[in-house]
Amino acid sequence: MTDLVLYQISGAVGTITVNRPEARNALTFEMYDRIAEICAEPSADGSVKALIITGAGDRAFAAGTDISLFRGFKQPEDALAYEERIERVLSAIETAPVPTIAAISGACTGGGATIAVACDLRIASENSVFGFPVARTLGNCLSLSNYARLVAMVGAGRVMEMVVTAKLLDAAAAKAIGLISEVHPDRQAVMARARELAETVAGHAPLTMRATKEALRRLREGRRDDEDLIVQCYMSEDFREGLEAFLAKRKPDWKGR
């Protein structure tokens, strides 16, 4: 299992690699759970400041859930438990204490696409394709939470079109609708850019990024409470450090508190 989800730390950046290229990085339950575990605690000592999530090889970021897992679904509870499990994983990615970057190459579909959407930033190679082709493949559906994530990102009309037509979007089309922010020639270029982005955000104020992640999540859920986020940032040591550093024209030394 450990070999199917690799985790490497280099400096302040952690990289999660879905490592099942022979199966287009199709995900088992254990693989989903391992991704969630890492996102919940990228490092025990807080040294990891940004996470990259990617897939091994250039054929797929992740083609979705391993289809063989669905053969055991017999009762309504099986379907509900599956979606609840996936939601816990996606929530762990969304609420990770550090920014997450999906570095995509190849197929990013189904469950793989939901992981990418749950990340804070998404960049892709030219050979990438995106979509939720369940209307022409399995005949299942997305959970309400996943529809909400997609609608918040690209709008209800585009989500409807993606699902009912079961059409896969190429990288250029995905960028045009805001599903990804950058397109690069190949996986090597994507990984280099992901590392650059990760190192950039790793040097920024941790509390600002956490507050922004949480605020956007709350907005998607229709919430308007933000007092705790405002107080957390404005009353922090980092805010005082930022003020002093700005006035002294030096680089701030962020502590995340």
Enumerate the language-model features and the residues they cover.
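Terminal low-complexity tails and localization/encapsulation signals of metabolic enzymes
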Residues: 1-2, 244-257
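Conserved CoA-thioester-binding segment of acyl-CoA-metabolizing enzymes
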Residues: 1-54, 91
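Glycine- (often His-adjacent) and acidic-residue-rich active-site loop
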Residues: 4, 47, 55-92, 136-138
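CoA-thioester-processing core
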Residues: 89, 93, 109-163, 193, ...
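A short, small-residue-rich loop immediately preceding and capping a beta-strand
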Residues: 97-107
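Well-ordered beta-strand positions
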Residues: 121, 161, 165-167, 173, ...
